[in-house]
Amino acid sequence: AAFREVTARIKRALKIPVVASNRINTPELAEEILASGDADLVSMARPLLADPELVNKAAAGKPEAINTCIACNQACLDHAFGMKRVSCLVNPRACHETELEYARAAQKKRVAVVGAGMAGLACATVAAARGHDVTLFEASDSVGGQFRLAAVVPGKEEFRETIRYFGYELERTGVKLKLGQRASAADLVGFDEVVIATGVVPRVPRIPGIDHPKVLTYAQLLGEKRPVGERVAVIGAGGIGIDVCEYLLHEPNISLKDWCAEW
């Protein structure tokens, strides 16, 4: 609710209903804004792409079941601006509901999913919801994959919400989760289907000195909190490179006052 304060000021100056919008992505926040009198109505757009059942789940008293919008804009706004079909990074069924129909499986199978990043979590929970017996293997001690790294970048803290949501879905759908277990061929014997969802690894360029102790990958920086010096060179200006710069330059818990001053 980044513009809540502005909405409240407008409401105090007008005698007509005022609608609050922008980053109101949970029912609790929406209720708080309405109860405080800062707005008469609340507008939600992206949160309903992330979970079209948001209102129904809130009304049923199950906010933990909501797939929360993380404001990534990677399939909604950017697609809209590019004249493409809008969808959602955390809900790929958005605007594809008639094409991606998760019908009950005609035959129950034993399915192994290797890797508990976002792709593996989505695959495992959908397969289980369709009636399959699913086991999910993850080599590390927690689920989330690359989203765990993204969540430490200032401004991307809400990526943790997607990890939380899939934790709920794993339990709801009955997926058997094997943490700290790197799946071997022996582990996968007896399954009818095996899905490999082990994700990506950083691409290390062949540059003289790349093996120097001061050279880090983004995973070592964000995931292991490796220390860096005062002057840092970042190789790669894609999304991850920008995130690394944001991580190095900004405090993770910026105040609303400082945020407003910056923007």
Locate each region found by the language model:
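Flavin-dependent oxidoreductase catalytic cores
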Residues: 1-114, 118-134, 142, 203
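Short, contiguous acidic/charged loop-to-helix segments that flank catalytic cores in large enzymes
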Residues: 101-103, 108, 149-161, 218-224, ...
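Short, charged, surface-exposed secondary-structure boundary motifs
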Residues: 51-56, 146, 205-206, 224-227
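Short, electropositive alpha-helical surface patch
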Residues: 30-43, 187-197, 252
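Rossmann-like dinucleotide/flavin-binding elements
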Residues: 109-139, 178-186, 190, 197-207, ...
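N-terminal Rossmann-like dinucleotide/flavin-binding domain of flavoprotein oxidoreductases
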Residues: 145-191
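A short helix-to-beta-strand connector/capping loop
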Residues: 38, 170-177, 211-215
